[in-house]
């Protein structure tokens, strides 16, 4: 689970982010996976899963993300975009770093209960936290993801 607030001094750049997110391929828009002259993802005979390795090394996560059919489209409100989305096993920290390099301002949180980690990314810094008990989870993440209800639901299922 990821929550992201994006802003930029240039309204056109912020609209570019909205359009990329709503197209469903925001990482690919800003950090495209290398392709050959035919537009196909480059295949490496030494690494049959080159796309996977490239994505994790550059985006920070296995798959791209963007608007899903069950999400509302991203919009600009008060000079920023606020979205929530899912990624596979890790947050897109490499992608956030690239946006920061392009003068976007990023404020993000992430929570991965299956792997017992969470974190806060702000001003180009990632505060990654592995937790063994719920007391280690920062209050901001606890509140943002409604973790009281989440953990009560998990306990009911056990």
What would you call each of these model-derived segments?
Residues 1-158:
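Intrinsic low-complexity, intrinsically disordered or marginally ordered coil/linker segments
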């Amino acid at each position: 689970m990821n929550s992201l607030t994006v802003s930029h001094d240039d309204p056109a750049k912020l609209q570019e982010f909205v359009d990329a997110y709503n197209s469903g391929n925001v990482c690919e828009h800003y950090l495209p996976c290398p392709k050959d002259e035919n537009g196909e993802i480059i295949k490496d005979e030494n690494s049959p899963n080159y796309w996977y390795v490239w994505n994790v090394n550059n985006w920070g996560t296995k798959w791209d993300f963007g608007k899903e059919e069950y999400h509302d489209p991203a919009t600009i409100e008060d000079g920023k975009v606020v979205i929530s989305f899912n990624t596979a096993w890790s947050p897109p920290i490499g992608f956030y770093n690239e946006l920061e390099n392009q003068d976007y301002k990023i404020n993000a949180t992430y929570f991965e209960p299956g792997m017992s980690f969470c974190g806060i990314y702000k001003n180009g810094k990632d505060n990654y936290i592995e937790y063994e008990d719920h007391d280690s989870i920062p209050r901001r993440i606890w509140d943002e993801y409604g973790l009281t209800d989440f953990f009560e639901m998990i306990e009911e299922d056990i």
